[in-house]
Amino acid sequence: MKPVTLPLLQQAANAFQFGGPVVCTLDHYGEGHINDTYVVWREDRSKRFILQRINTDTFTDPVGLMENVCGVTRHLRAKILAAGGDPMRETLNVVPTLTGGSCYMDADGGAWRAYDFVEGTVCLQQVGSEADFCTVAETLGRFQNQLSDYPAATLHETIARFHDTANRYANFEKALAADSMGRAAGIAEEIAFVRAREADCHVLLDQLAAGEIPLRVTHNDTKINNVLIDETTGKGLCVIDLDTVMPGLSAYDFGDSIRTGANDCAEDEPDQSKVHFDLHLYEVFAKGYLSTAGASMSLAEKKSLAWGARLMTLECGTRFLTDYLEGDHYFHTARPGHNLDRARTQ
């Protein structure tokens, strides 16, 4: 995609119903690295908005993506209103274009969308306390519960086979067979570790195929910084970054949160002696999640959550190892062996 210029940003901003002229700057907002995210203000500084250019290299169907976002946020809004909540703070709100659409396509093929800015909130970048992790868990569980009656099969798959662990394993075997970089000989222990767990990769998909667990609307990127928290009360408000909302399993969202939150070191820590799984944080998260999501889940689905924690970690580690074998093309690396360190940490 072409770099965003100020004229392009202003042109995109002028395509949305912001209630008056807005002021733009090229200062990027937030910690995300996929989309281009900016804050725009009304000229009178009465209100601000999030304006984003969707990364169409990653999300090749931005129209389908926004159909997902609009459908899910409408559903959430209705649930929040019925419960007496505040839909302007408890879910994302899409700002329509001047023509009533959900995204604007610029002359270069760039896809833009806008949201109301949720004021008075923070995103946690790491787990600072048990209370923080519990708050994130409760918010994600509530998100799951509110969408439990949404027809998941109607959603577009924005990234094909994203959490298909068996397919990720197959890709690993292809990369290993090709060994295009000649790296396989140096990672025999890691290869054996993954291969010993091939059967595990099929467990959740087999349960789904057997009808033991249901297809759900899942977020699929449940890092703790994708939850907005009220900066005054500390209450979890809403889940953001809905680009990967797709049909999936509740175990995926539960497991990915555990993968990132219950590991007490950086994802790319090179010293493996520092890597530990905090079982107590797992228990804290599980209790918080089930306190808000549990009413809509069967016993079999609740039991599947532990498998989610195991498989999301295995899947991510396998993806890092696959990328290492293929020459580090997918994940950005900052040093030799970076993806190998990431794989080992998982």
What do the PLM-derived regions correspond to, one by one?
Residues A251-G294, L311-Y330:
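Active-site activation/catalytic loop segments of kinase-like enzymes and analogous catalytic loops
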Residues R344-Q346:
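Amphipathic, Lys/Arg-enriched alpha-helical patches that create a basic surface
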Residues M1-D27:
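Juxta-kinase regulatory segment immediately upstream of eukaryotic protein kinase catalytic domains
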Residues D241:
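Conserved active-site aspartate in kinases
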Residues P3, D27-E31, Q52-R53, F59-V63, ...:
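ATP-dependent phospho-/nucleotidyl transfer catalytic cores
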Residues T25-K174, G248-S250, G261-A262, A266-S273, ...:
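Conserved ATP-binding subdomain of kinase catalytic cores across diverse folds
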